[in-house]
A protein has these predicted regions:
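Conserved short S/T/G-enriched processing/targeting/catalytic segments and their helical context
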Residues: 1
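Noncatalytic scaffold domains of N-terminal-nucleophile
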Residues: 5, 9-184, 188-211
Length: 211
């Protein structure tokens, strides 16, 4: 849709990058990070954006070791200590700044994802295949369980709607305020508090200082 409204490939990439958190949550989310390579046709320049996650300021070299000094996979893979400061929102915003047409705002590009999160997407294909594999892990988190599980604890079945109203609110904050809507204010405070409550070390300052 973006190119038909006068947008560039960069606009389209940002719009597409905003959708996986809603429609492909196990692999694409605003709590992660990534890389993007952009070719600027007008100047012939190639631009690379590194928006991978960064370690919280309180991270140490020994934080993933057990009492005997050996690596502990549970700490590094399945605990809140492993939560890095997310870069996706900053990366997509920078891509929009560097390669956008100037005709479409960040809100214009995120709005379709907001609608999908609010109105729901069908549980099909990858979501239907992978939810059963993640059922026990999802059930551990009170904020995720009502989204991906039914009231009886079973996973959403093919054909059911995946509704994500809280994600819609977060995306709306980003659309309204840009990266600050995610890295500062209520969203950042709730995110940092949830990580800390689960035993992690990420703080609101870590989020605010992400670059």
């Amino acid at each position: 849709e973006s190119p038909h409204r006068g947008g560039t490939a960069g606009d389209a990439a940002v719009a597409v990058g905003s959708a996986p958190p809603v429609s492909y949550p196990r692999a694409g989310n605003i709590g992660g990070g990534g890389f993007m390579v952009i070719h600027l046709a007008k100047t012939g320049q190639n631009v690379t954006i590194d928006y991978r996650e960064t370690a919280p300021a309180a991270a140490t070299a020994a934080m993933f070791l057990d009492a005997s000094g050996e690596p502990d996979p549970k700490k590094s893979r399945d605990s809140a200590l492993s939560v890095g400061v997310p870069g996706t929102v900053a990366g997509l915003a920078l891509a929009h700044e560097k390669s956008g047409s100037g005709k479409l705002s960040l809100a214009d590009l995120i709005d379709p994802a907001i609608a999908l999160a609010r109105n729901g997407v069908d549980v099909v294909d990858d979501i239907a295949d992978t939810l059963p594999l993640a059922q026990q892990r999802i059930a551990r988190w009170h904020s995720s369980a009502p989204v991906f599980l039914n009231s009886d604890g079973s996973v959403l079945a093919p054909g059911q709607d995946l509704l994500q109203p809280d994600l819609a609110v977060t995306l709306r904050a980003i659309a309204r305020d840009g990266p600050k809507g995610f890295y500062e204010g209520p969203v950042a405070e709730k995110l940092a508090a949830a990580v800390r409550k689960a035993g992690g070390i990420m703080t609101v300052d870590d989020l605010k200082n992400y670059r």
